């Protein structure tokens, strides 16, 4: 199967001893199981892809009529979270109803994990953009203020995307090239080295690294 991605849930973090005895921080991810709900083909849609759905219990009354018909056509149970993933091989035999499991990933390979980061609300420039800040003493009255932005006679305006205080977090972020430390096929668990966007319990999408280093 050429599907190189899977939907999951971030469970939390732990520590694992690797082969050389080093203690590394890892994120525990529940990866799948997923089911192919829809198949996109180059003949009908112009590209090759598969729409995956995460297998978990969903109350039928929480699903609208349009999505109920969509799931009924695929002959699968209603699902809360779905994600479309591209398929590279045009002659791939992936079809509706196929299961996508964590066994598609191997220990030691690199993956990209996408999720929604933790929301921080309105934050200042020091926390949001890592400004150095002003002097902490000697009469300074600007400890955490942004300071000048260099807009005098030129350009006489504020540059677009100028770093200012504002809303921080709660955006979709991708952590790239995370190394798979362990794969547990019995419990559908994937341990990756390092941190992953979002709080525990958030939905994430795992795919094999696009730009592996």
Task: Show where each model-derived region lies.
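Extended basic (Lys/Arg/His-rich) segments that typically form rRNA-contacting surfaces
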Residues: 1-213
């Amino acid at each position: 199967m050429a599907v190189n991605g899977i939907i999951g849930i971030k469970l939390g973090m732990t520590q694992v001893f690797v082969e050389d005895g080093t203690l590394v921080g890892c994120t525990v991810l529940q990866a799948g199981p997923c089911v192919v709900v829809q198949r996109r083909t180059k003949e009908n849609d112009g590209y090759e892809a598969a729409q995956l759905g995460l297998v978990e219990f969903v109350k039928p009354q929480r699903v609208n009529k349009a999505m109920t018909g969509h799931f009924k056509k695929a002959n699968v149970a209603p699902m809360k979270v779905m994600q479309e993933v591209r398929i590279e091989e045009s002659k791939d035999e992936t079809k509706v109803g196929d299961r996508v499991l964590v066994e598609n990933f191997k220990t030691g390979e690199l993956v990209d994990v996408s999720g929604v980061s933790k929301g921080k609300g309105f934050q200042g420039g020091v926390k949001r953009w890592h400004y150095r800040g002003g002097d902490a003493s000697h009469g300074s009255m600007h400890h955490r203020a942004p300071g000048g932005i260099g807009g005098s006679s030129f350009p006489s305006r504020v540059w677009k995307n100028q770093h200012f205080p504002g809303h921080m977090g709660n955006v979709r972020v991708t952590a790239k090239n995370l190394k798979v430390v362990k794969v547990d096929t019995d419990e559908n668990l994937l341990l990756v080295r390092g941190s992953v966007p979002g709080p525990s319990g958030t939905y994430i999408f795992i795919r094999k690294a696009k730009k592996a280093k």
